[in-house]
Design a protein with these regions (language model features):
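PRPP-associated nucleotide enzymes
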Residues: 1-173
Length: 173
């Protein structure tokens, strides 16, 4: 299945000069969504993943579905102030500004967590979540899975430089 057919490009959004790849074309099509989730589940089972760390907010869509199908727990990585209880927190630079991501201190990740998001561009968000995981939890390896990988941007290399093993479903060269 060519998922690029289901990903419309929205020019000049969220700011001028940015061509936004809209994953809602996948989420509104059950066949495309199912195909995507099957690929993510394969990544989970092939790598003996112990938990999925879902990135706020579009990562939740894919992580929830993949978690159910693979019987893998889903932990939420959210923007600052969105999680109850005590949290670990890390501020990082994004493509457009700075942001803060948090994980609950009582999260159970296991030895092989998988960070899941909709899109990889510069890698900032996944690297921030990776930082939180490695600073605060005991893990063997950290993996990442994204629906869309913008290979012309430095994200994939940034993840490799931090020993994060990446699976991507749709690649844009």
């Amino acid at each position: 299945m060519n998922l690029k057919e289901y990903i419309p490009v929205v020019p000049n959004w969220p700011k001028p000069g940015v061509n936004f790849l809209d994953i809602s074309g996948i989420t509104i099509n059950p066949l495309a969504m199912s195909y995507c989730v099957e690929r993510l589940v394969k990544c989970i089972t092939d790598n003996d993943i112990t938990s999925i760390v879902a990135v706020d907010s579009r990562g939740f869509l894919f992580a929830g579905a993949a978690g159910i199908q693979s019987a893998t727990p889903v932990v939420l990585a959210r923007k600052k102030g969105k999680l109850p209880g005590e949290c670990y927190s890390h501020t990082y630079a994004t493509e457009y500004s700075t942001d803060t991501v948090e994980l609950q201190k009582n999260s159970v990740l296991g030895a092989r967590p998988l960070i899941m998001d909709d899109l990889l561009a510069t890698g900032g968000t996944i690297l921030a979540v990776n930082y939180l995981i490695k600073q605060n939890f005991t893990v063997e390896s950290v993996f990442a899975a994204v629906v869309i990988n913008l290979k012309f941007l430095p994200g994939e290399k940034q993840l490799a430089d931090h020993s994060i093993l990446l699976t991507s479903i749709v690649n844009y060269e």
